[in-house]
Regions:
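Structural signature of tandem-repeat unit edges
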Residues: 3-5, 14-31, 42-55, 65-78, ...
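Short, aromatic/basic amphipathic alpha-helical patches
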Residues: 473-484
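Consensus positions within tandem repeat domains that build extended binding/scaffold surfaces
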Residues: 34-37, 57-60, 80-85, 103-106, ...
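Extracellular/luminal Pro/Thr/Ser-rich low-complexity repeat and linker "mucin-like" segments
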Residues: 5-10, 15, 378, 533-547
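Cellulosome-associated attachment modules in secreted, modular CAZymes
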Residues: 500-605
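Short, solvent-exposed loop/turn elements at domain surfaces
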Residues: 7-8, 18, 555-556
Length: 605
């Protein structure tokens, strides 16, 4: 094909094995090999290109599976996208020094390519140029190249040595992803940007140091580099990406530079060899799951300007024994220290006003806790199974104790709930087996929710209530089975031994002066979640009642449940009763029947 007096090669006959392209055709110089000119010429083995060729088009030789060697002539300036992609038997490629531009995926999938000589004047490389070149072992990027495109060497499973140019400023996403033989790499001092997953799954990489000029590091940059032992993050980086070093299982030493303001989510997730880390004072926020699963982490120095610790930040850091919380810390997210079984104390500063749920769940060695008086609510399971915690002083401004907040805190013998607290949630103190005394203020209006608050507190003998017996009987209890209703109640500081009985009967009341018989006022007992038939317990009859309701309503019949019973049957609180609620009922009964103490919060997730 002729264009402006120049000839472009557009193809050849099928089945050709050797191809020699002439320098001119009918007096017109051959300057280009057109797009897809020899696409999938599967018998083609050798190609000779003249120096007159200035450009090689997209997919020009793509899929030529028997082509073994290619020399791009000295006159060629550009090689377009996928020009030699999928040439699975191509072993050697030499690019003349006039080549300035390589398009994307030029040699992608050339799985036999072991030797590459790039043009000394190469300036631009597209993404995926050598993607999945599984035989490639070494390569030197020419000095004029400033950007390494995305996935350039992704999947080069034998690549072990790469020389990067001194002037390179950017390594784009997944550039070296899945290069397991790459053990060492020196990043150029001019580098400013490291893209998403740039070295992800480089399982042989042993150490890395980010240069001073780096300002941006993408998510997963070094994720799953399982041999990485040392990492230094320096320079002007303000934010480190999510999962940056996640699953770097040998990472034992990390240096973080001053200037960072945030540690990204899951940054060191499951770095099981990391033993100590000092976080720069410039950091104000630690993301979610940042150090989660760092089971060898023993020492962490939190920055003085830290304001927020994200959810799961130190979850299951079982070797962590102590943490010094800085004075400016405002909030700690859900499960932040859950499963830190070695943590012995948690002394929170006055500024901390928010604790998420399960923050210290399963901290079985925790013996000392200080809470800020600014905290108004303790969420569900915050201190669940903190079995060694002997006591706790609750915040003065506390209004709500959530579900299972102190579940199975066996060290408690006495608990004083502060004045102003209004609600004590389901299982809040359940199975605190050594709890003997509880002080409850007059401000409390509800004890329990979907379940009782003091179930399994077999040592509980005395409750000291600030109000009168009349006030006590106005409190909403989830069930008359709650242990707290079976012990001595001290009203207004006066000892009373009461027995709660059904409405219409009497309660004997003893005081130090006289013994009187008074009419009992049954506590207000709303529905109990799961107790569909209203008999005060949760068992198979409740499952049957719920199933019957679902079956009846499915065929247009009345379900025959009262409003309270329907509310009790709506386990997931979706506003309707269906097979999901029946499943949750069965699951709850099975767990508790097997001896696994569980709440509705454990079942409905």
């Amino acid at each position: 094909m002729l264009h402006n007096g120049n000839a472009e090669i557009t193809g050849c006959a099928a089945g050709v094995t050797a191809l020699e392209i002439p320098a001119e055709i009918d007096g017109s110089p051959v300057t280009a090999v057109g797009d897809s000119a020899f696409l999938k010429q599967q018998k083609l083995q050798t190609v000779s290109l003249p120096d007159s060729v200035q450009s090689i088009g997209s997919q020009a030789f793509s899929g030529c599976i028997n082509l073994q060697e290619i020399t791009v002539p000295s006159g060629t300036q550009s090689v377009s996208n996928s020009a030699f992609s999928g040439c699975t038997n191509l072993e050697k490629a030499v690019l003349g020094d006039s080549v300035e531009t390589l398009g994307s995926s030029v040699f992608s999938g050339c799985e036999s390519l072991a030797e590459v000589q790039l043009s000394a004047n190469l300036q631009k490389m597209g993404g995926s140029v050598f993607q999945n070149c599984t035989a490639l072992k070494t390569v030197a990027i020419p000095e004029q190249v400033q950007t390494l495109g995305g996935s350039t060497f992704s999947g080069c499973s034998r690549l072990y040595q790469v020389k990067l140019p001194a002037k390179m400023t950017e390594i784009q996403s997944c550039a070296f992803e899945d290069c397991p033989k790459l053990e060492t790499l020196t990043l150029p001092e001019s580098l400013t940007t490291l893209g998403y997953g740039a070295f992800q799954n480089c399982s042989g990489l042993q150490n890395i140091s980010l240069p001073e000029q780096v300002t941006e590091v993408g998510d997963y940059a070094f994720a799953h580099c399982t041999a990485l032992e040392q990492a230094a993050v320096s320079g002007n980086v303000l934010t480190l990406g999510k999962n940056m070093f996640c699953d770097c299982r040998r990472l034992a030493e990390v240096t973080l530079a001053e200037g960072l303001t945030e540690l990204g989510n899951s940054m060191f997730l499951d770095c099981v060899s990391l033993q100590a880390v000092t976080i720069p004072d410039s950091v104000t926020q630690i993301g979610e799951s940042t150090f989660s699963g760092c089971t060898d982490l023993q020492h962490v120095t939190l920055p003085q300007n830290l304001k927020q610790i994200g959810g799961n930040a130190f979850r299951n850091c079982s070797s962590l024994t102590a943490v010094a919380f800085p004075e400016k810390l405002k909030s700690i997210g859900n499960e932040a220290f859950s499963g830190c079984s070695g943590l012995q104390e948690a002394l929170l500063p006055d500024a901390t006003d928010t604790l998420g749920y399960s923050v210290f769940y399963g901290c079985t060695s925790l013996e000392r806790v200080r809470l800020s008086d600014e905290i108004t609510e303790l969420g569900q399971t915050v201190f669940r199974q903190c079995k060694k915690l002997p006591e706790i002083t609750l915040p003065k401004e506390l209004t709500t104790i959530g579900e299972s907040t102190f579940f199975s805190c066996d060290g408690f013998t006495r608990v004083e709930i502060p004045d102003g607290t209004q609600r004590i949630g389901s299982n809040a103190f359940s199975y605190c087996t050594n709890l003997k005394e509880v002080v409850i203020p007059k401000s409390v209006t509800q004890i329990g929710g979907a379940f009782e608050s003091f179930a399994g507190c077999d040592s509980l003998t005395d409750v000291y209530y600030a109000g009168s017996e009349e006030d006590w009987n106005k409190i909403r209890f989830c069930t008359t089975l709650d242990k707290i209703l079976k012990v001595r109640i001290h009203f207004n500081g006066e000892l009373s031994v009461t027995t709660t009985t059904p409405a219409g009967t009497t309660t004997a009341t003893e005081t130090t002066a006289t013994t009187t018989v008074t009419t009992a006022t049954e506590p207000v007992v709303p529905f109990m979640k799961g107790d569909v038939d209203g008999d005060g317990k949760i068992d198979s009859s409740d499952v049957f009642a719920a199933m019957l309701y679902v079956a009846y309503t499915a065929v247009g019949r009345a379900g025959n449940l009262t409003d309270d019973q329907m509310q009790a049957a709506d386990i997931d609180e979706s506003g309707s009763i269906d097979s999901t609620d029946v499943y949750y009922l069965l699951y709850y009964i099975a767990l508790n029947g097997a001896g696994v103490r569980s709440t509705w919060a454990d079942v409905v997730k």
